Each structure stands twice: as structure tokens, then as C-alpha cells.
Amino acid sequence: MGIRKLKPTTPGQRHKVIGAFDKITASTPEKSLVVGKKSTGGRNNTGKMTMRYIGGGHKQKYRIIDFKRNKDGIPATVKSIEYDPNRSSRIALLYYADGAKSYIIAPNGLEVGQTVVSGSDAAPEVGNTLPMANIPVGTIIHNIELRPGQGAKMVRSAGAFAQLTSKEGAYAIIKMPSGETRKILAACKATIGAVGNSDHALEKSGKAGRSRWLGRRPRNRGVVMNPVDHPMGGGEGRSSGGHPRSRNGLYAKGLKTRAPKKHSSKYIIERRKK
């Protein structure tokens, strides 16, 4: 999946770098796998703002993604590669041999017409999903479960991948994209390969309007706010704001926010890089 750097015909085009849609083969999603999606504007059920800088944007419909891949032993053919407005990666439409249809996150190298399968007996090939107990050591994987049968929770964004480094008893040792090394039950499933659309990280909006299309509002700096709005606000004229803090008053640079007694810490062998 490539990128397009536009010619500077207007100020908004000058620095714009967008993804190329050359690998996308269908413009309309599968109707049975699409549901409506209500925009929240960053508000919760009581109307209170819980997330700043969200609002507006183009109306989006949610594509139902199969993160469980539990149709074991039934081969599926890749019908199309599609754009999904709800995530950075592309999605692939699968037609199963029994007539079922589903969407999966499209891994790098997956082509239309290719056959994928899930289950313990599946070959460790791109797009196939199998328990990590059956995946060879050193394999690049994504869409990793944290609990067997729960569905993929980790390594799902564009270009992301983890590596199965070793196995110890009932656990598989995984090196995560963050650099963290941790144990996960070997009965958990993972999909072979890296997530596609790796050039997503190189994209640039080019203009404020494109950010608004995506539902991103202007992000105001704390140092230019009033003291009532932010710990770094106020002062006479321009001020440095003192020690960088979040809006809640926590130190913004270097403070560890992970709970010291979190139960899952015993599964982490090596903490992530800074």
C-alpha cells in the first residue's frame, strides 16, 4: 500500500501526503456486515464531555469485524480489500465455504482470491489464525488474544506486528510493538503476518479541514488557557507554565501511570521502551 504526495497547487495541498487506494477493490461495503454508528462528540450518556477535541466529521458506518475467527477448519476466500473509516488498517471481506461472510483486518500481503483458514490444523501462512501453541517460534503475528476465545485485543493498527520469541509451558513469550516482552497463554489465537497499510504513519493531513472531516477538533495548549481550565494556565504575558502537567495535574513527562499492584504485571518480562 503506497502513499500519494500531492503537488503544491494550493496551500492545503502543499504538504498533504495521503494513502493511495490502489489496493482497494470495492467501494461499497457488504450490507449485512454494516451497522449504524452514532457520533458521541466526546460526550458520555449524561451529556458530560469525557474526551476533548472530538466532534463533527463525516458520518460513518461501523463494519462488523470478526476478531474471534472461530469458524475452524472452514476455508474462506478473500472477496475484496476495503477501506474502513473506523480504523487505520484496511479490511478484507471473506466468503466462507459454508456461505457465511465476515470482515477481518487485512494483513500485509493478503490478495483477492487468496484462501485463508483458522484452527489448530491451519498452516502458519499469512492471514491464517491459529493458537500460538501451533505457531513456529520467530513468526511475525498480529490480532492477538489475551484470553482464549475472547477475540483479538492487541496489535490491530496499521503496520503493527508482534513476534513470537519462545514458548514456556502453557505460555508463549511475545515481543510487542512497544518493545514490551510478555507472557500470553499459548491457547490464545493470533493471526500470521503484520497488519497491512504500513504507510499510514507517513500520512499528513495538509490542512485543518481534513482533520475536521475525520472528527478531530483543534487541540488547544494548556499554557494558553486560564488557571481555572488547566494547571499550566495563567500568568502575566507569555509564561512557560512551569512543570509540564496534564489537565488533571499529573506530571506529563516521565511519570509512570501504571498501577503498581496491577495483576497482569506478573506476565510482563520486560517493560516497554520509553
UniProtKB/Swiss-Prot annotation:
Residues 207-220, 255-274 have a biased composition (Basic residues). InterPro entries: NA-bd_OB-fold, Rib_uL2_dom2, Ribosomal_uL2, Ribosomal_uL2_bac/org-type, Ribosomal_uL2_C, Ribosomal_uL2_CS, Ribosomal_uL2_dom3, Ribosomal_uL2_RNA-bd_dom. Keywords: Ribonucleoprotein, Ribosomal protein, RNA-binding, rRNA-binding. PROSITE patterns: RIBOSOMAL_L2. One of its GO terms (biological process) is cytoplasmic translation. One of the primary rRNA binding proteins. Required for association of the 30S and 50S subunits to form the 70S ribosome, for tRNA binding and peptide bond formation. It has been suggested to have peptidyltransferase activity; this is somewhat controversial. Makes several contacts with the 16S rRNA in the 70S ribosome. NCBIfam families: rplB_bact (TIGR01171). Belongs to the universal ribosomal protein uL2 family. This is Large ribosomal subunit protein uL2. It comes from Parabacteroides distasonis (strain ATCC 8503 / DSM 20701 / CIP 104284 / JCM 5825 / NCTC 11152).
